[in-house]
Amino acid sequence: MIKDYKFDEIAEIFTGIRVKRYQKGITVKKKILKKTYEDSSNIETEDVQVSEDINPKFYSRKDDIVILLAGSTVSKLEKEGIIIPMYYAVVRVKEGFDVDFIYHLLKSDIFPRELHKIVEGTTLKIIKTTHLKEINLPIPDYETQVEYGRLFKLMDKRINLNQELIELERQNEKLIMKNLLEKLGDN
């Protein structure tokens, strides 16, 4: 059975931190999430010098979901301890809901359709976390979430492996061409 939930009923949702405020005084090197417009689990980070006074809630936890507020890109974080900057909404799924299912629901056609109703701006669409919290999402019972969450996670792994295979094939193609040209050049 599917039930509609407001987004803030299934997850804690808040905006990341304004990093520049923490770059004065005594600082340490930390990883920060880079802005990305690609839907992916392959998250890029960069090193920045920041104060150690940053509230722990702004550091990533395993299975955090982040949504880029200026483009609605949805990503799932596997690594802990990465600073999440203010141009991301952090989604921490509450107990009783499956993280993998919620992540894939947010990547589905349903979420962008609901999001389209609330975004502001003409040229650059901006998402506000207060509006995000009001989005209605259809959620099945927990067992169904877990079952399909596992399926989607396995499908993601297969997609990533196939992408790696494609990249290896491209490298092989270049290497074969290079070897051919070297061989023909020796004659």
Predicted feature descriptions by range:
Residues L68-L106:
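A short beta-sheet element
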Residues M1-K29, S41, D141-N187:
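Non-catalytic DNA-recognition/assembly elements of restriction-modification systems
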Residues F101-I135:
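Conserved, surface-exposed functional patches that form binding/active-site neighborhoods
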Residues K76-G81, I110-K117, K133-I139, F152-K153, ...:
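A general structural signal for short secondary-structure boundary/capping elements
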Residues Q49-P56:
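Short alpha-helix capping/helix-loop boundary micro-motifs
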Residues Q23-K30, K57-S60, K76-Y87:
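Short, surface-exposed loop/turn microsegments at beta-strand edges and helix-strand junctions
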Residues F7-V19, I32-S41, F58-S75, L105-L115:
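Short Ser/Thr-interspersed hydrophobic loop/turn segments at strand-loop and sheet-helix junctions
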Residues I82-M86, G121-E147, K153:
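A short glycine-rich beta-alpha junction/loop motif
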